[in-house]
């Protein structure tokens, strides 16, 4: 069994503190029980199989044919799902167990149903195409018929008008006119015409191209169809125009036909005879009625077939997915030399050994195998996967940690502390118990409806909110807590726990100033005294309070991170990291910023007027100068000199000893000597394992180790300053949230109230609600969430968390049943 360390006694036993102890197991499974064994292990979901055939392509593996079969069945099931979705036929809940049906029977049944459904669809498509063509033809007959009818009427009217004019002219001119008519009638040209429909968006270009191609020797008329029509070729609705093109000559006709084809214009025959047109419309209408009846009958038959499929759809779907997953896993197993057994290797938690052996035994019995499977644990130097047992409450927090990087095997897990610190730091920036209650109500809806919502397909944003519902619950509860401390309810203070400790000295005292206020009662018991809100000194006081509080919280969390590095070093038995990483880092951080935190607390307790900026700056610039009025306690100057010296000494202690000790250990190991003062460290093992491959003497890159340590030291020293400053975002975002709340309340709600107009008040309330929800409950929540994320990923986790492991991914059927392929 692979173990990276054994000194776990320094921490209380908890499931999330360190990942589960893993083991590399080997399974030797008889061929006749292999399928059932993998199926039972998939139900168990506690074995991560290794691919022992990685050098083979997918087509060269033993069960490639079975996977191809399952893939074909999965294709048919996807086809059924699409058809059911289009027809609006729901799949019924799964009835029975997938183990009760045989895969061969499913394959035959799916093939029969697909063939029948494809035939019905083909017939229906053919009928629907004919129906759509006849609908277009009917529209052409109607619209073009209207054009020809109006043209005939116009020509008749014009003829009558011409005849009446000619009757009144001189009789001597009549023979000449008759002669001219006879001459013109002999020179008349026979015009042809084409009718059809063209997409409306192409109609203008279509007309222009026709005109240019025939050099203007055409006459075209178009009529708009009010309602969209279904195109016979694409089957989609489209807006179209009916066109009639008159031309002269076969050459022009061939050009027009080619242009119609290029523009996707559907052409239909048309007769000039009005009687024939009416007859054709009657015939087309009758044919449409017949087709409609036939299509409806076909759709009814198809829906009955789809309902039959829907009854068994989920069962077949799960069966095919499970079988495909089983055969994929079987392809990762190797055949032994006798070709009678399959050999599997994989990672599993130590606690699951008994369950795995029980599954192997059940598979052997249920498959009537003459020989049982063999379970044995292998020794290995490979790094095991990381596995944390989580529940629906802790899984979201663990996902937040894993998004930065998966913990190294049995490395201390930041998620244990993040469960509390993440929502708390969020709430420091989002401290308003009114807003907290709003988020709490929304979260309670997600939690109370979680069973219903879990079975539904949600949108991306809703799915993220639902997955992190318990994180949001903690965020809302802590927001209510910090909001009570800040005494803010939508920026309004309430004396919830007691009256204000201060009161006006006389009647002339204004509420907008603290001048003249005297303390008449005990100190306000919890949180901020409401008298501060609205006073002239409110902003300076809150700025000072929140800024100092941010530094205290930041230094505390960074110290926690460094302390966790000690537990890691002790667990992995790395004395070098304890003496030359943990101790110097603690000294450096607390000599500077730990000291600043102590000064803040002393100043709060004593009410001193000392300038802490001046104290910290001149601690470096002029350490020998007297502090004067900035002195907070006796011998402060001496203490500062000692702390400054310790901080300076701790830097070379972090940088120099560790690389030389690792080099000394490496040399002693290869000379057969034991290095007595210090235990073998995790870093030296890492160098040995990865330095020289399979050679007898691994190469030790001292320069690489030294540069790495130099970078790590510089990063910590500079990070101690920048990370502490980074925690000031707690103050900045808290102030921004408070000021935005105040602006929305005073400049929107109170302003609307002051007009004494119901309409303005309603508008003001609506604007206030939308601004509160959109800006404060959505944008500000997201902003505070991201800043809290940054504080944990960078400022906290970089003190101890390597995060270079890989996640335990067991073979399981849990997700197979819920996810699409």
From Swiss-Prot:
Residues 443-469, 570-581, 662-758 are vacuolar. It holds the Pfam family V_ATPase_I. Residues 2-421, 491-548, 603-640, 780-821 are cytoplasmic. It is found in: Vacuole membrane. Expressed in etiolated seedlings hypocotyls. It is a multi-pass membrane protein. InterPro entries: V-ATPase_116kDa_su (IPR002490), V-type_ATPase_116kDa_su_euka (IPR026028). The chain crosses the membrane at residues 422-442, 470-490, 549-569, 582-602, 641-661, 759-779. The modification N-acetylalanine is found at residue 2. One of its GO terms (biological process) is proton motive force-driven ATP synthesis. Keywords: Acetylation, Coiled coil, Hydrogen ion transport, Ion transport, Membrane, Phosphoprotein, Transmembrane, Transmembrane helix, Transport, Vacuole. Disruption phenotype: When associated with VHA-a2 disruption, day-length-dependent growth retardation associated with a reduced accumulation and storage of nitrate ions in vacuoles. Increased sensitivity to zinc ions due to a lower zinc ions sequestration in vacuoles. Reduced calcium content. No effect on sensitivity to sodium ions. GO terms for molecular function: diphosphate hydrolysis-driven proton transmembrane transporter activity; proton-transporting ATPase activity, rotational mechanism. One of its GO terms (cellular component) is plasma membrane. Residues 97-144 form a coiled coil. The modification Phosphoserine is found at residue 174. Its main location: membrane. V-ATPase is a heteromultimeric enzyme composed of a peripheral catalytic V1 complex (components A to H) attached to an integral membrane V0 proton pore complex (components: a, c, c'', d and e). Belongs to the V-ATPase 116 kDa subunit family. Essential component of the vacuolar proton pump (V-ATPase), a multimeric enzyme that catalyzes the translocation of protons across the membranes. Required for assembly and activity of the V-ATPase. Involved in vacuolar nutrient storage (e.g. accumulation and storage of nitrate) and in tolerance to some toxic ions (e.g. zinc ions sequestration in vacuoles). This is V-type proton ATPase subunit a3. It comes from Arabidopsis thaliana.
């Amino acid at each position: 069994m692979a173990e990276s360390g054994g000194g776990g006694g320094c921490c209380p036993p908890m499931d999330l503190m360190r990942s589960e102890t893993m083991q590399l197991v080997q399974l030797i499974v008889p061929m006749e029980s292999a399928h059932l064994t993998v199926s039972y292990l998939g139900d168990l979901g506690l074995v991560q199989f290794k691919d022992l055939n990685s050098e083979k392509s997918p087509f060269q593996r033993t069960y490639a044919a079975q996977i191809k079969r399952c893939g074909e069945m999965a294709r048919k099931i996807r086809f059924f799902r699409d058809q059911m979705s289009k027809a609006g036929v729901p799949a019924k809940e799964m009835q029975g167990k997938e183990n009760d049906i045989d895969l061969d029977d499913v394959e035959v049944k799916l093939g029969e149903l697909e063939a029948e459904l494809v035939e019905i669809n083909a017939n229906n498509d053919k009928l629907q195409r004919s129906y759509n063509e006849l609908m277009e033809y009917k529209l052409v007959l109607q619209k073009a018929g209207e054009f020809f009818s109006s043209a005939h009427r116009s020509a008749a009217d014009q003829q009558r008008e011409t005849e009446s004019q000619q009757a009144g002219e001189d009789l001597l001119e009549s023979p000449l006119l008759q002669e001219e008519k006879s001459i013109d009638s002999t020179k008349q040209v026979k015009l042809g015409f084409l009718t059809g429909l063209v997409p409306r968006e192409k109609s203008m270009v279509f007309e222009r191209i026709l005109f240019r191609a025939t050099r203007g020797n055409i006459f075209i008329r178009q009529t708009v169809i009010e309602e969209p029509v279904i195109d016979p070729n694409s089957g989609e609705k489209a807006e179209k125009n009916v066109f009639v093109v008159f031309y002269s000559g076969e050459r022009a006709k061939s050009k027009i036909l080619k242009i119609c084809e290029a523009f996707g214009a559907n052409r239909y025959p048309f007769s000039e005879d009005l009687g024939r047109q009416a007859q054709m419309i009657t015939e087309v209408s009758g044919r449409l009625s017949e087709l409609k009846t036939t299509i409806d009958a076909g759709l009814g038959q198809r829906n009955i077939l789809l309902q039959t499929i829907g009854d068994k759809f989920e069962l077949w779907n799960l069966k095919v997915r499970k079988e495909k997953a089983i055969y994929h896993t079987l392809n990762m197993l190797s055949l032994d030399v006798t070709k009678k057994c399959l050999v599997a290797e994989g990672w599993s938690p130590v606690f699951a050994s008994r369950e795995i052996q029980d599954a192997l035994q059940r598979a052997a019995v249920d498959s009537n195998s003459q020989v049982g499977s063999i379970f044995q644990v292998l020794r290995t130097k490979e790094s095991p996967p990381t596995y944390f047992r989580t529940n629906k409450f802790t899984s979201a927090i663990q996902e937040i940690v894993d998004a930065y990087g998966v913990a190294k095997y049995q490395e201390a897990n930041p998620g244990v502390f993040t469960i509390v610190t993440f929502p708390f730091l969020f709430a420091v920036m989002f401290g308003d118990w009114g807003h907290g209650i709003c988020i709490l109500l929304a979260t309670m809806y997600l939690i109370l409806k979680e069973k219903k919502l879990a079975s539904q397909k949600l949108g991306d944003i809703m799915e993220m909110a639902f997955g992190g519902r318990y994180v949001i619950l903690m965020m809302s509860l802590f927001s209510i807590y910090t909001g009570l401390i800040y005494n803010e309810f939508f920026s309004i203070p309430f004396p919830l726990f007691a009256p204000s400790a201060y009161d006006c000295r006389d009647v002339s005292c204004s509420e907008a100033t603290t001048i003249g206020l005297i303390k008449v009662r005990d100190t306000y018991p919890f949180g901020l005294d409401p008298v501060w809100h609205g006073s002239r000194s409110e902003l300076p006081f809150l700025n000072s309070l929140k800024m100092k509080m941010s530094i205290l919280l930041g230094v505390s969390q960074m110290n926690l991170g460094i302390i966790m590095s000690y537990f890691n070093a002790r667990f992995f038995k790395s004395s070098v990291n304890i003496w030359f990483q943990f101790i110097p880092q603690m000294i450096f951080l607390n000599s500077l910023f730990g000291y600043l935190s102590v000064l803040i607390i002393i100043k709060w307790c004593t009410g001193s007027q000392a300038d802490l900026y001046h104290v910290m700056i001149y601690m470096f610039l002029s350490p020998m100068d007297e502090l004067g009025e900035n002195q907070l306690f006796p011998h402060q100057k001496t203490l500062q000199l000692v702390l400054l010296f310790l901080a300076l000494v701790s830097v070379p202690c972090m940088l120099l000893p560790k690389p030389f000790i690792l080099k000394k250990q490496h040399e002693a190991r290869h000379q057969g000597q034991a290095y007595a003062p210090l235990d073998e460290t995790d870093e030296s093992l890492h160098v040995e394992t990865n330095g020289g491959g399979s050679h007898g003497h691994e190469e030790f890159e001292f320069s690489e180790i030294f540069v790495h340590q130099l970078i790590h030291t510089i990063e910590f020293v500079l990070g101690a300053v920048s990370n502490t400053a980074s925690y000031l975002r707690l103050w900045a975002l808290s102030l921004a949230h408070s000021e935005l709340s105040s602006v929305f309340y005073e400049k929107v709600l109170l302003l609307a109230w002051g007009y004494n107009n119901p309409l303005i008040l309603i508008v003001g309330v609506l604007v206030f609600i939308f601004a509160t929800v959109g800006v404060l409950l959505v944008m500000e929540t997201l902003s505070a969430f991201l800043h809290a994320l940054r504080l944990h990923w960078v400022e906290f986790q970089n003190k101890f968390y390597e995060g270079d492991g890989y996640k335990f991914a067991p073979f399981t059927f849990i997700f197979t049943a819920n996810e699409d392929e």
